[in-house]
């Protein structure tokens, strides 16, 4: 069990949990681990970027100081999306990248996420190596001086390369589709107008007024209410919402209904399959994807491979078996023909491309997708990882699954960040599904409750 790194890097309340001191250590120790085996013996290069949080610059300066202290050349990208940084690390042939962002979390939080030279998140083993160095009582890492110290190069124009990359994935303009775009007052906000104007999109934007304090504040991929209203009000065919670092995309259809990652993958995957471009006719998702998604894919002859929760695990499964599309219900979508990580803006563009190529609305494209009602309850418990040892809990789950008779599913899993057990079920109706969950929750509370 890692001490500092969670499922998406190191996160916490900025200046209290994630302090400048910790950022310095992460820069120093992380930079060393990622560049110590540089084969050509030259100076290592690491790209650093951040989202729009007020704490970003504070942590950025501390992190960069740590990198410089072990002799690393830093390319400072300024405000950049997380997938944008991942792309630039590969495009520049850099040794690593570091993104300062807490993604969809509130402004009080921030995070530090490392990428290897391949633009991918680090393995658990690499993160563990960094943690061991952080916790070592005496810092024995190299301390170069004079010409051995690292330097900083301004690389804010790297955003131009990233935008050009996104545009090059679209074979034609996207004129004829009216779209409202929610930038979450985050990293994508700086690039939306340039990107969508270049592709002749008829678009308006909301939540792109940056002040360092309003990122994800009742906007973006986790708060789509305003976007839903604007799509209907403006008579748009589509709404696109990104989160703070734009690795997610959630859509809104022409009627103002939210369209999550499952639905987006269904639309893009169906189009790719119809044109022989969905590798192995398979879409990779996590265990959280709706049962209706799997059944809709089956009707189209598309397979659904599931992993544990986390886009890292989706990405690993895709790379290991040569799949080309995968993601999460939350809006992380990986289109590996173009990028090896979830990219909200790339996802939004390709959703629009399917609409233009088919001449269909989102409602029409999703006509065969019948979502199963889902109920999720988070139960406070004493030991979230011990639930399988409680026979009464196991029996309650088995009883519910037997009653479902194949027309539903149960998923019980520990929270990745809190002492909670998540009990989720999907079934034929909301009422029946709620009853299923209540039965399990009652037993969990009795057996494991605080």
Curated annotation (Swiss-Prot):
InterPro entries linked: A-D-PHexomutase_a/b/a-I, A-D-PHexomutase_a/b/a-I/II/III, A-D-PHexomutase_a/b/a-II, A-D-PHexomutase_a/b/a-III, A-D-PHexomutase_C, A-D-PHexomutase_C_sf, A-D-PHexomutase_CS, Alpha-D-phosphohexomutase_SF
Record's keyword annotation contains Magnesium: yes
CDD domains found in the cross-reference section: GlmM
Keywords, alphabetical: Isomerase, Magnesium, Metal-binding, Phosphoprotein
One family name in Pfam for this protein: PGM_PMM_I
GO cellular component, one term: cytosol
Binding locations of Mg(2+): 103, 243, 245, 247
Manner of cofactor binding, per the entry note: Binds 1 Mg(2+) ion per subunit.
UniProt PTM: Activated by phosphorylation.
Protein name: Phosphoglucosamine mutase
SUPFAM superfamilies given in the database record: Phosphoglucomutase, C-terminal domain, Phosphoglucomutase, first 3 domains
Its EC number(s): 5.4.2.10
Domain of life of the organism encoding this protein: Bacteria
PROSITE patterns, A to Z: PGM_PMM (PS00710)
